[in-house]
A protein has these predicted regions:
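Sec-dependent N-terminal signal peptides
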Residues: 6-13
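Positively charged n-region of N-terminal signal peptides that target proteins for export
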Residues: 1-5
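Bacterial signal peptide processing site
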Residues: 20-23
Length: 410
């Protein structure tokens, strides 16, 4: 019996070694024989990393751990069944999942059986691993036509001229303890969309306790809905590079017991173009998304420090709009911030203020609670007033997170 088991194990190893060589990927089985001489019982962990050029369908009966960069190449599809928990080694920025241009991810959980990406640490924390990266062929404003840019993490191409590009489907997916830092500038987000098109389906997503941003859009046209971002140490939602999709039903909750080193930044950081790496000082067009049904929960409008700890982080803006971005926000609730909307830039390269004048940057139906400043005008255009930017003050109801977030979020 023991010899038969060992022969089977050798055969299994050879099969997966062959697959690994074909796909230029690493598949490692840790198999423990627990039969005690009285039968066969096999406990299996499958470690995943490398580049997959063929489809990869995960088995719900196997424990998967990501131990490096897992890249799904052009033409391949990663399929993850509902209810799976996929753990990543707590090794920081080098552990991530990337869906390349031309590849797809099909990760469709349910409210009762969400798909979870998390850390394998016994005491998990923000930044344990990288995150999930999707790269598509939709337009970005740093290049024209079919030209591409290169992603901050993984160094993969993104962008193009296919607005309805399809990178797959994400439904009822929770991403925990992401945001591992590569260096002083390059950090993983929980969920990064690089030039992702609106043929991609994204609905019911939670980012929980990440070290960097929760969700970031680098151009593209992808539409997302039912997004919960909670207890992030940086911004909750970012956009840049000409993002022009829709963001519908958003719940953002900042760290409720912050310290000087453990606190949230902005709920939304919104850029018309990306100059973080000097790659786009002359954008082809500016970001212009539509954001609807939003609830943002801060920790109070006061700005008080005591014994080196932030008692209330009201110095942070809820929403920062800059670098020429346009956007229409509708039905918004903001609670507990020193500033609600901070708008920067009004010169030729940063025409954010002009977007207000042109009615392309507006907030419609919003309710402020415990907010000191509703509209901070840093555009350089002193003629702009709160009334030019905000309408329907007191009419915002936000999103019904208690209903749509029930059962699958933390």
């Amino acid at each position: 019996m023991r010899n038969n088991f060992l022969l089977s194990l050798v055969a299994l190893t050879l099969i997966f070694t062959s697959c690994a060589n074909d796909d230029t990927a690493d598949i490692v089985f840790n198999i423990t024989n627990n039969n005690g001489g009285g039968g066969t019982s096999v406990d299996t962990d499958v470690f995943l990393s490398g580049t997959y050029t063929n489809d990869l369908t995960l088995d719900a009966n196997i424990n998967y751990k990501i131990n490096g960069s897992l890249v799904i190449a052009d033409g391949a599809t990663l399929t993850i069944p509902a209810g799976m928990t996929i753990k990543a080694l707590a090794a920081g920025s080098d552990v991530y999942v990337a869906i390349s241009q031309g590849a797809k991810i099909i990760a469709e959980g349910t409210a009762n059986s969400p798909i979870v990406f998390t850390s394998d640490a016994s005491e998990p924390k923000a930044g344990d691993w990288g995150g999930l990266i999707l790269l598509g062929k939709a337009p970005i404003n740093s290049v024209t036509g079919t030209a591409t840019s290169t992603s901050e993490i993984a160094g993969l191409p993104y962008g193009g001229n296919i607005a309805n590009d399809n990178s797959g489907s994400l439904k009822y997916v929770r991403i925990e303890y992401s945001g591992g830092s590569a260096d002083g500038q390059s950090e993983n987000n929980g969920l990064s969309f690089y030039g992702v098109g609106n043929g991609t389906e994204v609905d019911y997503i939670q980012i929980y306790e990440g070290k960097d941003d929760g969700v970031e859009f680098f151009g593209g046209t992808v539409n997302v809905s039912h997004v919960a971002v909670m207890d992030l140490q940086d911004d909750s939602i970012d956009w840049t590079e000409g993002y022009s999709g829709t963001i519908t039903d958003v719940y953002i909750q900042h760290i409720q017991n912050p310290t000087e080193t453990f606190n949230s930044d902005k709920a939304f950081e919104c850029d018309g173009y990306n100059d973080d790496f000097g790659n786009n000082s002359n954008p082809v067009f500016f970001s212009n998304p539509t954001v609807t049904n939003v609830t943002i929960v801060g920790v109070g409008s006061d700005n008080t420090f005591q014994d080196g700890k932030i008692i209330n982080a009201g110095q942070y803006e809820a929403v920062r709009l800059r670098r020429g971005t346009a956007a229409i926000f509708s039905n918004v609730q903001i609670t507990g911030f020193g500033e609600a909307f901070d708008v920067d830039g009004n010169d030729t390269s940063d025409p954010t203020g002009q977007a207000i004048v042109d009615d392309e940057l507006q907030v419609n139906n919003v309710t402020f609670t415990d907010v000191t400043t509703k509209f901070k005008n840093d555009t350089g255009n002193d003629t702009l007033t709160e009334a030019d930017f905000i309408s329907g003050d007191g009419n915002g109801t936000g999103t019904d997170f208690a209903t749509w977030g029930s059962g699958w979020t933390k």
